[in-house]
């Protein structure tokens, strides 16, 4: 999964929970007010696209690590963290998201998902399976449908 950064401890990304937070690289939207605009491009600036579902970026863009390193970080924090928050960019844009959620669940961690909800069919698929269903979703509604082109750079429905 293409992740641009990791926060090993957060008390603010999931209300009432202590988590690690990962930021997915890439977002199909281009919101004018995006606070993570460096994560919009699917290839980090000055770097190549991250093709492997096992490869992620570490603490800095382009600092490659494997997804198992994220899981090692979580395993080392059993009893300290309640879960993993997956943010972005846009997590629903990654085909590896279901596997990442399932891996965190298999280790006993809850999963929170920050998403714009841009891909409702992908979100429905996650919700239909216990192994990939996030325990919490922070849904960031960008704008009313008639304002999406000016706010998010996309038209309603795509």
For each predicted feature, which ranges?
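N-terminal [4Fe-4S]-dependent radical SAM core
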Residues: 1-23, 32-59, 77-78
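A generic structural signal for ordered alpha-helices
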Residues: 5, 9-12, 62, 82, ...
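Short, small-residue-rich loop/turn micro-motifs
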Residues: 26, 38, 141-143
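Hydrophobic packing within well-folded, soluble alpha/beta domains
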Residues: 27, 31-34, 104, 113
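A general structural signal for well-ordered alpha-helical segments in protein cores
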Residues: 31, 67-71
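Conserved non-cysteine loop/helix-boundary elements of the Radical SAM core domain that shape
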Residues: 39-66, 90-95, 129, 148-158
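Conserved AdoMet/S-adenosylmethionine-binding subsite of the radical SAM
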Residues: 71-83, 92-158
């Amino acid at each position: 999964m293409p992740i641009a950064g990791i926060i090993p401890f957060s008390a603010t990304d999931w209300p009432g929970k202590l988590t690690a937070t990962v930021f997915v690289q890439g977002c199909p939207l281009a919101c004018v007010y995006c606070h993570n605009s460096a994560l919009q491009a699917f290839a980090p600036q000055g770097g190549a696209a991250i093709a492997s579902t096992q490869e992620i970026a570490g603490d800095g863009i382009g600092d490659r690590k494997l997804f198992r390193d994220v899981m090692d970080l979580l395993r080392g924090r059993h009893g300290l963290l309640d879960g993993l928050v997956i943010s972005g960019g846009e997590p629903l844009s990654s085909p590896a998201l279901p596997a990442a959620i399932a891996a965190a669940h298999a280790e006993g961690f809850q999963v929170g998902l920050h998403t714009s909800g841009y891909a409702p069919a992908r979100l429905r698929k996650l919700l239909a399976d216990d192994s990939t269903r996030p325990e919490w979703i922070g849904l960031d509604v960008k704008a009313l449908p008639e304002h999406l082109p000016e706010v998010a750079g996309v038209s309603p429905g795509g």
